[in-house]
Amino acid sequence: ALEYGYETPESFTKAFTRFHGTTPIEVRRDRSKMQLFLPLHVSIKIQGGSKINYTVEKTEAFTVIGFERLFSFETSYKEIPDFWTEMYKIHAPNILAGKGPKTEVEHAIMENYIGEFGVCIEDAPAPGKFRYMIAGPYQGGKVPQGMKLYTVPANMWAKFACVGALPNAMQSVNTKVWSEWLPGNKEYDLAGKYNIEWYSADGDPDSTDYESAIWIPVIPKK
């Protein structure tokens, strides 16, 4: 884990096993190789007097690599955390035991920081379904069997900071974004049928100062 940028084996464990079941029902919810432009830092007050902090940034297209599965909107809240647990049990035991990566998949997990992103992609042909990826920024090289690539188009993103223990911190911000910020926003419309959860590999997901974020693609209103 240390070789691939994680400060300790424990930090990798936390990054890989964190809670990821926050995909909202019936809403659309990277660092490497991304070029950022014109960051706009904003803090707005919403109902109840609380504030939500976000940045608006443009990025070039970038590619993620990870494990993908099809989910139903109605059952995703339960099934996505189970998906993370399943992938952890199958692919991470050697790494977490301090033995280092031994298979192509294990090397890909470490080299591409799998677990940094949760990616929701609403392009499934079946109604009521969407693709979800446990992913990381693709660094190039062979794609092992069982893993897939997805290229996120160049976009303008509204990135909402979440600070606090999971899942409550992200769920709270997520609710505010979709129920209050987006419907009442006078500057941006939703763009694209994909969105991203970002999770820090450092810190304790149960801590009050743990950092994560919600990214949604936006376009200026005409």
Residue ranges and their predicted role:
Residues E10-K222:
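A solvent-exposed interaction/effector surface
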